[in-house]
From Swiss-Prot:
Catalytic reaction(s) noted: Endohydrolysis of (1->4)-alpha-D-glucosidic linkages in polysaccharides containing three or more (1->4)-alpha-linked D-glucose units
Entries under Pfam families matching the protein: Alpha-amyl_C2
Positions marked as site (Transition state stabilizer): 39
InterPro entries named in the record: A-amylase_bs_C, Glyco_hydro_b, Glycoside_hydrolase_SF
Domain of life the protein comes from: Eukaryota
Binding site for substrate: 19, 25-27, 38, 44, 123, 150
Lineage: Eukaryota, Viridiplantae, Streptophyta, Embryophyta, Tracheophyta
Miscellaneous comment: There are at least 4 types of alpha-amylase in barley.
SUPFAM superfamilies per UniProt: (Trans)glycosidases, Glycosyl hydrolase domain
Record's protein name: Alpha-amylase type B isozyme
SUBUNIT field: Monomer.
Length: 153
């Protein structure tokens, strides 16, 4: 779902019940998430994540409840190691875990915005103006191509 969502269908990241879709919404404590792996992704070309949106994928999986996995090739070969490190640091600093509370604030074609444990807010998508959706008391922690993460100060 995530690999389709980042290509202009970010509304897919909110199910009809308001939670994250599929297993990640039903039972996040047991869900393991990844952007690509050696069987499906960039090396096999079976169903690769859009290469220009890989960091949006990591911004999502590393800030959301569940158990995220980082693909070796992305971390060591592709070059976004520092961006991934920043996102891992946010996750660690705020104690995000597989049972953290997720509140999806907005999910449209060009904007996904969610708050995790009341401590972290993540934005995906090309929409720059998020209006009043980011409450006071948050500051930027990480950002890149079509994603941003804020943390409570």
């Amino acid at each position: 779902i995530l690999n389709v969502a980042v290509e202009g269908a970010l509304w897919r990241l909110r199910g009809t019940d308001g939670k994250a879709p599929s297993m990640i919404g039903w039972w996040p404590a047991k869900a393991v998430t990844f952007v690509d792996n050696h069987d499906t992704g960039s090396t096999q070309h079976m169903w690769p994540f859009p290469s220009d949106r890989v960091m949006q994928g990591y911004a999502y999986i590393l800030t959301h409840p569940r158990t995220p996995c980082i693909f070796y090739d992305h971390f060591f070969d592709w070059g976004p190691k520092e961006e991934i490190d920043r996102l891992v640091s946010v996750r660690t600093r705020h104690g995000i875990h597989n049972e953290s509370k997720l509140q999806i604030i907005e999910a449209d074609a060009d904007l996904y915005l969610a708050e995790i444990d009341g401590k972290v807010i993540v934005k995906l998508g090309p929409r720059y103006d998020v209006g009043n959706l980011i409450p006071g008391g948050f500051e930027g922690a990480a950002h890149g191509n079509d994603y941003a993460v804020w943390e409570k100060i």
